[in-house]
Amino acid sequence: MSERYRVLGENLKCGEKPKLAFICVHNSCRSQIAEALGKKLASDIFESYSAGTETKSQINQDAVRIMKRLYGIDMEQTQYSKLISDIPEPDIAISMGCNVGCPFIGRPFDDNWGLDDPTGQSDAVFEETIRKIHAKILELIFRVHFS
């Protein structure tokens, strides 16, 4: 795994940004948050995408509301629920967590963040999930940029 990040870091030095995909079943909450935070925090390090094996008609409204409040990001203006086949082939594929069933993406995941789905939970639970995703994005920046 660290070898993969080292190669991606070398490619970044040559001007090639790696593509990272954040995957969960419905692409409506955790993966959307990760895509939004990846774009906000790491757009100069990697390209962020999110997808699922199924889609929802809209992004989780609690996630939209809380991300707008915490980061000023309006996910409904910049993102939508997508299938895995709708995004470019990623260099790194990250599962958000399998508490709702792991989607099959045609290859093994490079990492599993093991995040519980906050859907239907309190704002405090959403905020904690968002903080965890934020920290994981910062770890990814370090792993890609400094490997």
What does each model-identified segment do?
Residues 1-147:
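Short polar/charged helix/loop
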